[in-house]
Curated annotation (Swiss-Prot):
It comes from Marinomonas sp. (strain MWYL1). The active site is at K301 (proton acceptor). This is Ribosomal RNA large subunit methyltransferase M. Its EC number is 2.1.1.186. Transmembrane segments: none annotated. Belongs to the class I-like SAM-binding methyltransferase superfamily. RNA methyltransferase RlmE family. RlmM subfamily. GO terms for cellular component: cytoplasm.
């Protein structure tokens, strides 16, 4: 398969394309992106016949910022009414064998209108795939994706376990907790699930730890720590939710998040303040370089244009400051499903 299809948040197609172009060229793959504004996906076309499939097998999905899902595809498949399954199955015979098949769309209002058609197609597609021998249990880690554009066209692609999301449409859906102070609480919940490895979860998020939440009010991010039994120093001039304060785990300090300094090293620093991204990046680097925290999760609020370039600038700035301070660290950046015009960064000191 020569091309790559990447799912992304609607409105972030150019940023997704800019990132993939840089990543692909760094590995010796060159082509061009087909970008339709607000489509919720991009298609990157390469010159080499097998470039798409080869590239995705070389990528680390967790290092991609704007991609929700990434699959290798060929050209669009035209579908005829009454013959959609047959058209897709014919194309599937040219793909590697797979252990499962997913039927998806972009995350847009227009695409949601296809949900009825997808439900009708799911059973006959799965049965057709099994009957033809395209699905095999031995094809471990290989998945086929039918990406429906409308009732008359679709992409058919393949993904590999080493570089993909394990959630349909690349979306990790979370339920808003009844006691949550604000919907922003879902951002940090998703960030923990995305960034904190399951094997180190108990060590990284342990009852009795202390976290600082800059710009905490009304307590959406603080809530995620409190429900894990972690103490929080909440920094904000605004009011905190009364129920959070009654837990006895929250110390509310009315102060400027950019001026506050902790009295001792804390286990976590989190920040969702609305401020220029470079200013937040410099503040986070200051905390880590000063030894005030060993772990940080924060959001960078992005401009309307050249968002990938802005993220790159922030990361380079932090890298320079931390290198100068002799801090060894690892990081991840992701445009999470519950993020909007922002990306979430996690940095942990080694």
């Amino acid at each position: 398969m020569k091309n790559v299809l990447v799912y992304c948040r609607q409105g972030f197609e150019k940023d997704c394309a800019a990132e993939l172009s840089e990543v692909a060229s760094s590995k010796g793959f060159y082509g061009y992106a087909k970008v339709v504004p607000d489509a919720g996906y991009i298609v990157y076309n390469f010159d080499q016949a097998d470039a798409g499939e080869t590239l995705i097998q070389q990528l680390n999905f967790n290092r991609l910022i704007f991609a929700r899902q990434i699959i290798a595809v060929n050209d669009v498949i035209e579908l005829e009414q009454g013959g959609r399954v047959e058209s897709l199955l014919e194309a599937a015979r040219e793909l590697p064998l797979a252990e499962e098949i997913w039927i998806e769309t972009a995350d847009t209002n227009d695409a949601k209108a296809l949900s009825g058609l997808i439900k009708k197609l799911e059973k006959p597609l799965r049965e057709g795939w099994k009957r033809s021998g395209v699905l095999r249990n031995k094809a471990v880690g290989v998945r086929h994706h039918v990406f429906m554009l409308d009732g008359e066209a679709a992409y058919l692609g393949v993904s590999y376990a080493a570089c993909r999301s394990e959630f349909p449409m690349g979306i990790r859906r979370l339920r808003f907790p009844a006691a949550g102070p604000s919907r922003s609480t879902l951002k940090l919940e998703e960030a923990f699930l995305q960034f904190v490895p399951e094997q180190t979860l108990e060590a990284d998020l342990t009852e009795g730890m202390t976290a600082v939440d800059l710009g905490a009010a009304p307590g959406g991010w603080t809530y995620q720590f409190v429900k894990k039994g972690i103490n929080v120093i909440a920094i904000d001039n605004g009011p905190m939710q009364k129920e959070l304060m009654s837990t006895g785990l929250v110390e509310h300090e009315k102060a400027d998040g950019f001026k506050y300094e902790p009295p001792y090293t804390v286990d976590w620093l989190v920040c969702d303040m609305v401020e220029r991204p470079i200013k937040v990046a410099e503040l986070m680097a200051k905390w880590l370089a000063s030894g005030w925290t060993r772990r940080a999760i924060f959001n960078l609020k992005l401009p309307m244009k050249k968002r990938y370039q802005e993220v790159t600038l922030c990361l380079q700035t932090m890298e320079g400051l931390l290198r100068k301070a002799g801090v060894s660290y690892q990081y991840q950046v992701k445009h999470l499903y519950h993020d909007r015009e922002e990306v979430t960064v996690c940095i942990m000191v080694k």
